[in-house]
Amino acid sequence: MKKLFKTISIILLTLFVSGLLILFFSPTPELLSDVNFSKAVYDDQHQLLRMTLSKDEKFRLYTPLSKISKELVEATLLQEDQYFYSHYGVNPIALGKALWQTYGVKTRRVGASTISMQLARIRFGINSRQVSGKLWQILRAIQIEMHYSKKQILEAYLNLAPYGGNIEGVGAASLVYFNKSVDRISLPEALTLSIIPQNPGKRTPQNHNLKHIRNHLFARWLVKHPEDGNKKVMFDLPLVMHTLKDLPFKVPHFTQQVLHDASITKQSIDTSLDSRTQIIVERITKHYLARKKMVGVFNAAVLLVDTRDLSVKAQMGSADFFNKQISGQINGIETKRSPGSTLKPFIYGLALDQGLIHPNTVLKDVPHSFNGYNPENFDYEFMGPIKAKDALVLSRNI
């Protein structure tokens, strides 16, 4: 039996060393460069207007490590890998303990995956529940440590870790669950996010034990940061989290224009749109349409621009983006259509410049026929003799 165990051990060690040598001379593995990310559009106060799905249907927003809450980074390491900066991809003590409890005494399955090992599993789709998969995961973790700094590894993990459903990475998770950028979250929110990747399927906003699990981590946090003891009152408050159905989808025509702008390549896009002004514009437009509904006006488009720098402050492409009866998804601002009465001031101005009329010139607002074409006014009526200035103000066509 001992001889068999020794033989198996030698074979496994040989395979492990061979695999390590192969990976050492293999090309550098990609961490984030070939990953497709979501895009997020913000207003002028950096409030989220819309976040898109990535090409593989994930909410995954790239966030550099420098833009991630330091408390979240530290809490994640406390929860997932306390010795992250001390090992080279594998924690041999934790791994040995896990192997003994899982396969030796067989009490319960214990995890011992480091941040690097978890990143390897996520990045390369490794099934780590099998022994062969676990060995491959270890080899890949060591390979990652060979080629990348701890900072790069941590950044990649925090951008790819699972946070429930199709939410990946702290950038998207923070926006979905707390409607905040990940550099603006509080300590309770940071600790809440840090406990989700360990069991993303169960640690959801609907889980009533989530607060208890988070507060247990806070107790460990206080051992390292006793100065945060005065924040305990924050952890006694109800844990309020949003879900994907609460994710903003505001000013859709405007955000579509921004997202389709080929010159914008970054994932997080700050715009000039003023959300407070946008709300006012939408309210005024809806009230106007409610008054004009009886005369057949059901749709409108509005563009509000700051003339000083031509930045867009508010925009409505239609009265209701989701209303099929008015073709609401068509952006009226971009649609080519007749200029209508827009040209009238210019025509009157040209006539004034050429001396053809003056403001008190009397014009005839009566029926005319031009080679079979019979123009009408918007009210289908004629006013007879009318001064030029009044004809312009009243938008007469004849």
Identify the function of each model-found stretch.
Residues Q47-L61, A172, N199, D261, ...:
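Short pre-catalytic segments that frame enzyme active sites
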Residues H46, T76, L119, I153, ...:
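Residue-level preference for non-acidic, small/hydrophobic
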Residues M1-D44, Y103:
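N-terminal type II signal-anchor transmembrane helix
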Residues F24-V73:
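Terminal hydrophobic membrane-targeting helix
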